[in-house]
């Protein structure tokens, strides 16, 4: 298996060498828009929600992603966490944003890798805030404008080499993650393709604060064959120090997929004291580090989508 993985790495690195790269400028532009005060902390059901969905949809279209059912939008109703003391919680309409890159292998094109990130945040705080400044916009630069920006940039780069893909790739910007993984729960209950055809879900939640040790953390690497080896080797190739957990799945949108017996990887660059506060701002994002993380995740998806590497769910204790 090690020889197979090495061959895959060499082939894929040569294949993508001449492609245009993800840039820190593009990542900055996305995060700058998402964290702008006019977006009011990206709260589900807010007046800016449609604008965010339109922005992501437009970027998917510009990258050449296909629609499901003639739309990038998947509408659902989110029950908001306003207070633990409120019995009947308010409900609002919001959306997941979904795009597709079709693979080219007659058989493997019916197997899908899902790349996802939630685009919502806390608005002005609420019960999930760690701050007492509940009248202040929580911009959520790392959580999770960083993951949303990564999603858009990786989608664009993969689209440019679509002809080399065997498996298909679904890209999802989830809504209402902060309200209890509601967007991803809705997706797996209303998947545009049969769940049995979803072979791996990679989730990016807080990928913008790479530390000096260049540690990228992930859970779920043991949920598919040779996952730990593959992620460790690809991480080193990317110049990162991957902290690979086999059985610790984590607690973000990928958990909704794991509960449906779908292999997962949950990617993040670690926690920090600005988490869920108004201080999670764009000036603290490590853009060079986020680019490295994006390149790593891009290479992971390309390696698995352009080969016949077996993807089978392995439950973890």
Predicted regions and their residues:
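Bacterial Sec-dependent N-terminal signal peptides
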Residues: 1-22
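N-terminal hydrophobic or amphipathic helices/low-complexity stretches enriched
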Residues: 16-67, 110, 317
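Second-shell loop/turn segments in exported
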Residues: 20, 37-47, 83-88, 133-144, ...
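Solvent-exposed loop/turn segments at secondary-structure junctions
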Residues: 38-41, 60, 66-67, 82, ...
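A non-catalytic alpha/beta surface segment that caps or lines the substrate-entry region
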Residues: 42-102
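Alpha-helical metal-binding/catalytic segments enriched in His/Glu/Asp
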Residues: 108, 115-116, 126-179, 297
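Metal-dependent peptidase/peptidase-like ectodomains
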Residues: 174-272, 312
């Amino acid at each position: 298996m090690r020889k197979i993985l090495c061959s895959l790495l060499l082939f894929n690195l040569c294949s993508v060498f001449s492609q245009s790269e993800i840039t820190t400028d593009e990542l900055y532009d996305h995060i700058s828009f998402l964290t702008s005060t006019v977006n009011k902390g990206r709260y589900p059901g807010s007046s800016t929600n449609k604008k965010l969905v339109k922005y992501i949809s437009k970027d998917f279209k510009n990258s050449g992603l296909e629609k499901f059912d003639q739309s990038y939008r998947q509408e659902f109703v989110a029950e908001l966490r306003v207070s633990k003391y409120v019995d009947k919680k308010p409900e609002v309409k919001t959306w997941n944003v979904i795009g597709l890159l079709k693979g080219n292998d007659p058989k493997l094109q019916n197997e899908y890798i899902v790349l996802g990130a939630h685009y919502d945040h806390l608005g002005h705080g609420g019960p999930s805030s760690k701050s007492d400044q509940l009248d202040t916009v929580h911009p959520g630069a790392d959580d999770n404008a960083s993951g949303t920006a990564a999603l858009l940039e990786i989608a664009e780069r993969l689209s440019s080499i679509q002809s080399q893909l065997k498996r298909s790739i679904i890209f999802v910007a989830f809504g209402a993650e902060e309200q209890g993984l509601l967007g991803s729960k809705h997706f797996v209950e209303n998947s545009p393709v049969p769940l049995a055809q979803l072979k791996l879900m990679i989730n990016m939640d807080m990928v913008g604060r790479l530390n000096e040790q260049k540690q990228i953390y992930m859970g779920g690497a043991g949920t598919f064959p040779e996952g730990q080896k593959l992620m460790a080797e690809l991480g080193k190739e990317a110049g990162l120090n991957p902290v690979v957990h086999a059985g610790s799945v984590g607690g973000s949108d990928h958990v909704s997929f794991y509960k449906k017996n779908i292999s997962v990887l949950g990617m993040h660059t670690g926690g920090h004291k600005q988490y869920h506060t108004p201080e999670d701002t764009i000036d603290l994002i490590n853009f060079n580090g986020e680019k490295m993380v994006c390149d790593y995740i891009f290479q992971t998806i390309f390696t698995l989508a352009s080969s016949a590497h077996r993807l089978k769910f392995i439950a973890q204790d």
